[in-house]
Amino acid sequence: MAISNNIRPGRHFLQIPGPTNVPDRVLRAMDYPTIDHRGPDFAELGLRVLDRIKLIFKTSEPVIIFPASGTGAWEAALVNTLSAGDKILMFETGHFSTLWWDIAQKFKIEVDFVEGDWRTGVDPNIVEQKLKEDKDKKIKAVCAVHNLSLIHI
C-alpha cells in the first residue's frame, strides 16, 4: 500500500468567508512606503475612499469605518451604551452570538440569552413577547447577530 503524500505544491488558498487570503497584488502594494497618517496625502486618500466606497455599498449615506474586528465592534457597542448591571436581551443564532454573550458577561451586563437554532435567524415574535414581558422596562438593549455567512442567514 502506498503512503499518500498530502503535501501539494503552490500556495494554499483558504476558501471560507473569512479570514481570507491576501492577493499577490495587495501584498506587492505593501512594499511601498507608508504615508503619514496625519499628513495631507492621507487625509485626501481617506476622503476619496470614503466617498467612493458608497458605490460599493450602494448607498448615498456616509460610510463609517470601525478600525477593529467584528468582536471589537460588539465590545464597543456594549461598553459605550451600557453599564454593569444593565439588562439586555440577546439571541443565540450561531457561534458569533455566543461570543457576544461572553463579552457582555465579562462586562457584568445581565443577559437574558434566548437559546436558538443555529440554522435560523431571530424570531421577531419572540422579541416582541420578551419585550412585552418586561413590564418594568429593565431591558436596555436587544442584541442579535443577524448575518452569519457560515450558516447562510
Locations of regions flagged by a protein language model:
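Active-site-proximal loop->helix
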Residues: 99-110
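Conserved beta-loop-alpha segment that forms the PLP phosphate-binding cup at the N-terminus of a helix
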Residues: 60-89, 93, 97-101
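PLP-dependent aminotransferase-class I/II
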Residues: 108-140, 144-147
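Basic/polar N-terminal segments that are highly enriched at the extreme N-terminus
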Residues: 1-9
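Conserved small/polar residues in nucleotide/adenosyl-binding loops
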Residues: 152-153
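A glycine-/small-polar-enriched, mobile loop at the entrance of the PLP active site in fold-type I
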Residues: 11-67, 71
